[in-house]
């Protein structure tokens, strides 16, 4: 009897010991696994965040340093997990390096070639179309592209629109009553590849009322001089116009700049564009703008504009989209940096997939543009 009791105690103790060992081993494995993942879970264990993604901007953007403020409109999650800096000391610890195409020089190129880091992506950021991007021959230097094109590694558009969860309240009468002028064209660059100047001047000859402003015509609005006007003066100046010319300096794949987004957005005008295909390919609602190439000739286009100008019901059809969609405030294209942070966070503590552009010029080439459009109307 006594022997049986001792045997039972021994078996019970052995069972408890085995269970304890399994629990400790399992717990230890879980801790080690979570350490490898950079995260701790459980009771009194300290929560440890994955280190922030560090994006080093090796060049400025048109001489203006690119800093953390570029993330100001990103989600809080992204802002808390990412840092953007132009501090040269971050080069050895950076998770990515960004170069703006118009600000790269031979000195920088030589340094970063000589001191190449193969564990992180070198990123070419180009917001201009191929005619103005300023690219020279970069062979086997860049790993990722960050441009306005949807097929970029990082899509970096000038603007975007999102569908509203709840239909917005739109005061159509207020919009109509604020419109006292027909069409505005504010333009600075006269060196366009697509003959936009000639097309606009032809429209005027056909009877379209267009007010011309900007460096090209050496005329600035007195109440809102370029870069010197009071805050909000641009909205006040543009808002009375029913339409605004939004011709880009080249007709290129996916190339839609702030010329379009601001006019449709904060200015509440109807943008006039050259060709519908570029905008439709981006999924922009057809009713947000008017395209010249919807008409067989300029006479019919001008007739349509004149008809819509004097007809409230017809004009307001171009504002119906405001109930369903809203334009995202892009703040000069920071959408791309939000997406870059998100993508890099997914690669944190992993090897970034290896990829290199053998010849970047062949990717960002003028073959993605068609500047012959206007000639059929001239």
From Swiss-Prot:
It comes from the Eukaryota. One of its GO terms (cellular component) is Golgi cisterna membrane. N-glycosylated. Its EC number is 2.4.1.65. The chain crosses the membrane at residues 8-28. It is a single-pass type II membrane protein. The keyword Membrane applies. Keywords: Calcium, Glycoprotein, Glycosyltransferase, Golgi apparatus, Membrane, Metal-binding, Signal-anchor, Transferase, Transmembrane, Transmembrane helix. Glycans are attached at residues 44, 88, 105, 143, 171, 307. It is an enzyme of class 2 (transferase). This is Alpha-(1,3)-fucosyltransferase fut-5. The gene is fut-5.
